[in-house]
């Protein structure tokens, strides 16, 4: 559960950290980031609301697979999308609905770890187990910041004054890092 949570946090934070850079330098309309973020917010909240209904019908393993498939499909669509808000928006919805499902499932997996520990060892160590989550969130944020910083330097975005100053190779580096 801890490794899954760490990878999820790094991926999620890396993707969201690049949002404004993508819309400014690749999409070339920084103002559309607000629209995109609103779409993602509604998608993620909707996913969190429908989670209980879906979780009653399918197993956690199937649900995790579904969430992962949605995220992967969203990333592929995002990478292949032309610079149009409709396909990019659809890709974002797929990514953030899948991530919302995974986020809740990881919390359930942590809870399962606590229950298993109590069953197996006769001790309930929820404080220790749950204290790992903030540590993972901080480490994930730090790794994501490192990825973002390296990407902005290597892609040339850091020194670009305008979106037109970024080469097509630099934009490809940005999309790959996201």
Residue ranges and their predicted role:
Residues 1-178:
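Membrane-embedded alpha-helical bundles of multi-pass transporters/translocases
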């Amino acid at each position: 559960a801890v490794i899954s949570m760490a990878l999820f946090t790094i991926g999620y934070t890396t993707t969201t950290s690049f949002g404004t850079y993508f819309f400014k330098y690749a999409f070339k309309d920084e103002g559309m980031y607000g629209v995109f973020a609103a779409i993602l917010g509604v998608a993620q909240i909707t996913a969190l609301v429908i989670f209980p209904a879906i979780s009653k019908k399918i197993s956690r393993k199937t649900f995790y697979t579904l969430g992962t498939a949605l995220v992967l499909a969203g990333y592929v669509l995002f990478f292949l999308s032309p610079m149009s808000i409709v396909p990019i928006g659809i890709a974002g919805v797929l990514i953030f609905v899948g991530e919302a499902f995974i986020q809740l499932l990881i919390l359930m997996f942590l809870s399962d770890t606590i229950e298993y520990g109590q069953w197996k060892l006769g001790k309930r160590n929820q404080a220790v187990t749950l204290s790992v989550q903030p540590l993972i969130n901080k480490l994930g944020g730090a790794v994501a910041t490192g990825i973002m910083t390296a990407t902005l330097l290597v892609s040339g975005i850091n020194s670009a004054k305008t979106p037109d100053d970024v080469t097509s190779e630099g934009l490809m580096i940005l999309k790959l890092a996201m």
